[in-house]
From Swiss-Prot:
Homodimer. This is Lysine--tRNA ligase. It is an enzyme of class 6 (ligase). One of its GO terms (cellular component) is cytosol. One of its GO terms (molecular function) is ATP binding. It comes from Bacillus mycoides (strain KBAB4) (Bacillus weihenstephanensis). Its EC number is 6.1.1.6. Mg(2+) 1 binds at residues 408, 415. Keywords: Aminoacyl-tRNA synthetase, ATP-binding, Cytoplasm, Ligase, Magnesium, Metal-binding, Nucleotide-binding, Protein biosynthesis. InterPro entries: Aa-tRNA-synt_II, aa-tRNA-synth_II, aa-tRNA-synth_II/BPL/LPL, Lys-tRNA-ligase_II, Lys-tRNA-ligase_II_bac/euk, Lys-tRNA-ligase_II_N, Lys-tRNA-synth_II_C, NA-bd_OB-fold. It is found in: Cytoplasm. The lineage of its organism: Bacteria, Bacillati, Bacillota, Bacilli, Bacillales. The keyword Metal-binding applies.
């Protein structure tokens, strides 16, 4: 901000504080009391928008509304303003001979951004705009800072994220995004509740970081004098509940991963995980596509959505494709025949796939997928059959134990869900954890830790189980056509602002 703008802003702050002082001198509370509203702006339009000017004059409908002043004009003994609430804006008309000298002075000295209450009659102007003619004008909150320019709003994207409250004031689109987010989560809950799932709550601080391959945040519990991890997944506690006999469970909650920030990643994000006893990953595929289609229909009214340049069809059934077939289809590389690590590395070299020297065949297969296939998956596609090396908690496939009964859901080249037939063999699970420990020793700090307590739980017997995790933030991005995860998080993680 240059010196002139800085000085102008300071002048505006001073003027508003002078007005604050004057209000108090007059015995008026600038941060007022409860105001009872009869209607929102949307109510007025839906209830009275179709009435003619003459019908409204005849009916003399009195309403009470409240909101923030967004525009204001007029001189002398009358003026107009637009006030805004959550749903939208409505015009108000204030006349000195109707509200009286004191209240009219409140109106004339009010600034953009002030919160006011209006009691008045609904009418239409000569050009047909639905409005409220004030018979009472109440100042509810004095705004001490000017709003961003109403014609330009918040053009600085970073400022929108840092000062979300200003973004919500100035952008109806942003408000609608977060209302839609709430509806998406509500419909997700409703779908699962109606299908017999039980919502539960499990700890966010874990003694062992498990359930995913990710770097955790650490903290220290002073009273217990022990290191704890902010959870990187909800999985292992929910599967303990399956062992305990809660046959269909889910949790919607925050997960924390100490990793990079991007348009698709935030260190703190929201997931839903669910588990169903006596089911497998095929059942979970059906549940996933039906649930997402249900949410789209209920919230958006359609299963055909626009995301960027793509028209996406969410109507089931979605494409199902084995990871090895997807790689062969998009790169020509064939991993169906068993091969040594050396052969897999040579294949990677031939196809210009970057790999690390510590990678086993399964890791190399996954790199082929990520580098050659992932960005081609636009329409909803279940990729299944992940290598066992990268799926320590998934059950091996009966026909080819190199692979697992696991799937990931891809839409517009992004992973939206991860699911599998859960590994319920405690001996196999311990061996998988031991293999993960070796990876940690070789420098993979995202490899899974040993969890003896979870192994012990499995030893009591967990029924065959299907499990699912969906990143809610990415789902909201998809359904609101948002290009960045920061657009669907009210307060995304940001670097410290430089002075």
């Amino acid at each position: 901000m240059d010196n002139m703008n800085h000085e102008e802003l300071n002048d505006q702050l001073l003027v508003r504080r002078e007005k604050l002082h004057n209000l108090r001198e007059q015995g008026i509370d600038p941060f007022g009391k409860r105001f009872e509203r009869t209607n929102s702006t949307t109510d007025l339009v839906s209830l009275y928008g179709e009435f003619s000017k003459e019908e409204l004059e005849e009916k003399e409908i009195t309403v009470s509304i409240a909101g923030r002043i967004m525009t204001k004009r007029g001189k002398g003994k009358a003026g107009f303003a637009h006030i805004q609430d959550l749903q939208g804006q409505v015009q108000i008309y204030v006349r000195k001979d109707t509200v009286g000298d004191e209240e009219y002075e409140l109106f004339t000295t009010a600034d953009l951004g002030d919160l006011v209450g209006i009691e008045g009659k609904v009418f239409k102007t000569n050009v047909g705009e639905l409005s409220v003619k004030a018979i009472g004008f109440t100042l509810l909150t004095k705004s001490l800072r000017p709003l961003p320019d109403k014609y330009h709003g918040l053009k600085d994207v970073e400022q929108r994220y840092r000062q979300r409250y200003l973004d919500l004031i100035t952008s109806m689109e942003s408000r609608e995004t977060f209302v839609t987010r709430s509806k998406i989560i509500r419909e997700m809950r409703r779908y699962l509740d109606d299908n017999g799932y039980l919502e539960v709550e499990t700890p966010m601080m874990h003694a062992i970081a498990g359930g995913a391959s990710a770097r955790p945040f650490t903290t220290h519990h002073n009273a217990l004098d022990m290191e704890l991890y902010m959870r990187i997944a909800i999985e292992l506690h929910l599967k303990r509940l399956i062992v305990g006999g809660l046959e269909k469970v889910y949790e919607i909650g925050r997960v924390f991963r100490n990793e990079g920030v991007s348009t698709r990643h935030n260190p703190e994000f929201t997931m839903i995980e669910l588990y169903e006893a006596y089911a497998d990953y095929n059942d979970i595929m059906k549940l996933t596509e039906n649930m997402v289609a249900h949410i789209a229909k209920k919230v958006l009214g359609t299963t055909t959505i626009q995301y960027g340049d793509y028209e996406i069809n969410l109507e089931p059934e979605w494409t199902r494709l084995h990871m090895v077939d997807a790689i062969k289809q998009h790169s020509g590389a064939d991993f169906w025949n068993p091969m040594s690590v050396e052969e897999a590395r040579e294949l990677a070299k031939e196809h210009n796939v970057e790999i690390k020297n510590t990678m086993e065949v399964g890791h190399i297969i996954n790199e082929f997928f990520e580098q050659k296939v992932e960005d081609k998956l636009i329409q909803p596609t279940f990729i299944y059959g992940h290598p066992v090396e990268i799926s320590p908690l998934a059950k091996k496939n009966d026909e080819d134990p190199r692979f697992t009964d696991r799937f990931e859901l891809f839409i517009v080249a992004r992973e939206h869900a991860n699911a599998f037939t859960e590994l319920n063999d405690p001996i196999d699970q311990k061996e998988r954890f031991e293999a993960q420990l070796k990876e940690r020793e070789q420098g993979n700090d995202e490899a899974h830790m040993m969890d003896d307590d979870y192994i012990e739980a499995l030893e009591y017997g967990m029924p065959p189980t299907g499990g699912l995790g969906i990143g809610i933030d990415r789902l909201v991005m998809l359904l609101t056509n948002a290009p960045s995860i920061r657009d669907v998080l009210l307060f995304p993680a940001m670097r410290h602002k430089q002075d």
